[in-house]
Amino acid sequence: MGKAKFERNKPHVNIGTIGHVDHGKTTLTAAITITLAKTGGATAKNYADIDAAPEEKARGITINTAHVEYETPARHYAHVDCPGHADYVKNMITGAAQMDGAILVCSAADGPMPQTREHILLARQVGVPALVVFLNKVDMVDDEELLELVEMEVRELLSSYNFPGDDIPIIKGSALAAVEDRNPEIGQDRILELMKAVDEYIPTPERPLDKPFLMPVEDVFSISGRGTVVTGRVEQGIVKVGEEIEIVGIRPTVKTTCTGVEMFRKLLDQGQAGDNIGALLRGVDREGVERGQVLCKPGSITPHTLFEAEAYILTKEEGGRHTPFFTNYRPQFYFRTTDVTGIVKLPEDKEMVLPGDNVKMDVELINPIAMDKGLRFAIREGGRTVGAGVVSEIKK
């Protein structure tokens, strides 16, 4: 399917519902589809359809995720909802379901709970750019002052994790009322208000095509009389023949020129996001570039060895470790196309990490890797995946 374009006249945005168990994430997801179905913007789905989330694998980890899609007059959305807390943790850390924004669901009757906190923290750590809040189950709270108190608490919580708590839209309503098509003043009217807030407040993501050129190196060939060809899938941006590019990671950064782009044995004048290409590099010998490096627009990404990460460690049942690990644990970190050994340093208050935990940790790699905040990786021991992580901060 080389160049088939996905025809769509509206901007596409990936979102999801997050929040504490039983606060109404799945009911809200159903409510959105049922409400938007009235104007032809969705196929109505009930709670049971969404709750029976199929299993999928991402970076060797099994995750249950339900996907629904719908549209507003302004945008097309792909929406993810997970049945269990562990699925959320895994989903957000592996980036299995990319989130350009999220709807934080919080029960007005209970206020913020432990997983409300944890999901906000995860959203911050994995780089979810914006949140909108749905304060659910308002029909279970008779006291207007109590409602205001919960709203204040949610705003303070968001601010404490460096989200703009004072500015984030908070919509109050009842997802169940919308699903049952009653009390529109707290039901479907509020769902429409929520979607308007999502349309306006969650920024349209930059398309991969508009980002600076980046291609992870998968293979390197030498073609006699022509030079060195590097193959891989262009992750983002465009590379044009004749442009200067950099080779970054593992060894010192090298500048070169792309003198040719091949795809399916045809010569092209450029390669773009999504293309599997061979890039011909000027003046680079076969030994000068290796799998695990990236080709990129000069200056757009830099190599690093020390970073903070948020990681999820697989349980024994998921095929992970059977025992905990401690500071100075030395697994391999699989970035894009290659493994690099790294040393783990745990936070002061964390003596050990048990299988099934998610944890913040510092990692020092023995070789530098081209990285940005938000880069995903797998944690492996002898080729077996034992965890997944995301770069939350670059330190060196």
Curated annotation (Swiss-Prot):
Q: What is its EC number?
A: 3.6.5.3
Q: Which GO terms describe its cellular component?
A: cytosol
Q: Which domain of life is it from?
A: Bacteria
Record's subcellular location:
Cytoplasm
Region (G2) residue spans: 60-64
The enzyme class is hydrolase
Positions of region (G1): 19-26
Q: What does this protein do?
A: GTP hydrolase that promotes the GTP-dependent binding of aminoacyl-tRNA to the A-site of ribosomes during protein biosynthesis.
Q: Where is this region: G5?
A: 174-176
From which residue to which does the signal peptide run? none
Against InterPro entries, the record matches this protein to: EF-Tu_GTP-bd, EF-Tu_GTPase, EFTu-like_2, EFTU_2, G_TR_CS, P-loop_NTPase, Small_GTP-bd, T_Tr_GTP-bd_dom
Where does the chain bind GTP?
Answer: 19-26, 81-85, 136-139
Organism source for this protein? Hyphomonas neptunium (strain ATCC 15444)
Query: Its Gene Ontology molecular function terms?
Result: GTP binding; GTPase activity; guanosine tetraphosphate binding; translation elongation factor activity
Give the start-end ranges of region G4: 136-139
Check the record and name the PANTHER family matching this protein: ELONGATION FACTOR TU, MITOCHONDRIAL, ELONGATION FACTOR TU-RELATED
Which PROSITE patterns does UniProt cross-reference here?
G_TR_1, G_TR_2
Which reaction equation describes what this protein catalyses?
GTP + H2O = GDP + phosphate + H(+)
User: What lineage is this protein's organism placed in?
Assistant: Bacteria, Pseudomonadati, Pseudomonadota, Alphaproteobacteria, Hyphomonadales
- Keywords annotated in UniProt: Cytoplasm, Elongation factor, GTP-binding, Hydrolase, Magnesium, Metal-binding, Nucleotide-binding, Protein biosynthesis
State the family named in the UniProt similarity comment for this chain.
Answer: Belongs to the TRAFAC class translation factor GTPase superfamily. Classic translation factor GTPase family. EF-Tu/EF-1A subfamily.
**Protein name, as recorded:** Elongation factor Tu 2
Its gene name is: tuf2
Give yes or no: UniProt keyword Hydrolase. yes
UniProt: Mg(2+) binding residues: 26
Quaternary structure note: Monomer.
Q: Residue ranges of region G3? A: 81-84
